[in-house]
């Protein structure tokens, strides 16, 4: 049985094994507090995320189980990797991952990004998404604060708590509003990996401009702002709207023409705008894919088709429709944690090569 140390951080009790020292708060999310720490076993800095009361409801239990399963399954250079997981005596769950130092949101609020860094960050986002999407997973909540970056400009996508199966009948209210794809707002269903490409397009535009592209005050305003740039949605897109109320709202909006991206982004490289326009398309069926985005001329300095891998296996979503009591989720969680530790030391696993792909060198400052 591991020894635990109890600390109070931001008024929140943190119970961690004695392996981790020098805890410092770095962020607070909707579902947990994140601290940096020193891992005495590996000598590296790590991030420890406390999942608050994971067994308080079946919904929270399932959400935590889903995130754990995904972190175990997704092994790629541009996806945050799990190095340890434990349940404390108070039955809180702690995920331990690598620490990257900052995120894209903080970078964007501190200074404008130069072209080569925008290219490199966008390349890594799409490289990670190509892998994630090939595993049958949709992130659903991509935004600058979920994209971690270190001092070498290595980028990793994190926070898979809302991720879901790629399913044409997906439902739900997800993603921070500014980055939310129109099909989520219009139909509440029938969306797939293309929602992540829309979010990436919004992030790309924000890197180019230094400010959010579609800063909606609410759901209605958000959609209205999108139409100010992209124009009125095509009829075939409007016909896919499932909700009568939403359909009436869209039909009530004034007819708008698309604004040329060169007008909206007068200082941007035309090649970058060509890629951006292919991402910010109303119809998800014609939106560019992650793999197609990687092959675009704008990312030519980094594109390497031999080193942009896909997942070896599609993620097993069989648990996702299960409506189980907390105690059952708890047993399943313990089983997954035991399995994780039985795989042996994570660094040994990495030495043997389970993490897919090597990221190219960062641009020179």
Curated annotation (Swiss-Prot):
Cofactor: Mg(2+)
Assigned keywords, A-Z: Activator, ATP-binding, Cytoplasm, Kinase, Nucleotide-binding, Nucleus, Phosphoprotein, Serine/threonine-protein kinase, Transcription, Transcription regulation, Transferase
Residues recorded with modification Phosphotyrosine: 173
EC numbers for this chain: 2.7.11.24
Modified residues annotated as Phosphothreonine in this record: 171
Residues spanned by motif TXY: 171-173
Binding site for ATP: 26-34, 49
Regulation of protein activity: Activated by dephosphorylation after osmotic stress or in presence of the fludioxonil fungicide.
Reactions this protein catalyses: L-seryl-[protein] + ATP = O-phospho-L-seryl-[protein] + ADP + H(+); L-threonyl-[protein] + ATP = O-phospho-L-threonyl-[protein] + ADP + H(+)
Localization of this protein: Cytoplasm; Nucleus
One cellular component (GO) term of this entry: nucleus
Domain of life: Eukaryota
PTMs per UniProt: Contrary to what happens in most fungi, is constitutively phosphorylated during non-stress conditions and dephosphorylated after osmotic stress or in presence of the fludioxonil fungicide.
Consequence of substituting residue 49 to S: Confers resistance to fludioxonil
Keyword Metal-binding: no
Record GO terms (molecular function): ATP binding; MAP kinase activity; protein serine kinase activity
Disulfide pairings: none
Pfam families (UniProt xref): Pkinase
Class of this enzyme: transferase
Protein kinase domain: residues covered: 20-299
Function, as annotated: Proline-directed serine/threonine-protein kinase involved in a signal transduction pathway that is activated by changes in the osmolarity of the extracellular environment. Controls osmotic regulation of transcription of target genes. Also involved in the response to UV radiation, heat stress and oxidative stress. Mediates the sensitivity to fludioxonil, an agricultural fungicide.
Record remark: domains: The TXY motif contains the threonine and tyrosine residues whose phosphorylation activates the MAP kinases.
Family affiliation: Belongs to the protein kinase superfamily. Ser/Thr protein kinase family. MAP kinase subfamily. HOG1 sub-subfamily.
Protein's UniProt name: Mitogen-activated protein kinase HOG1
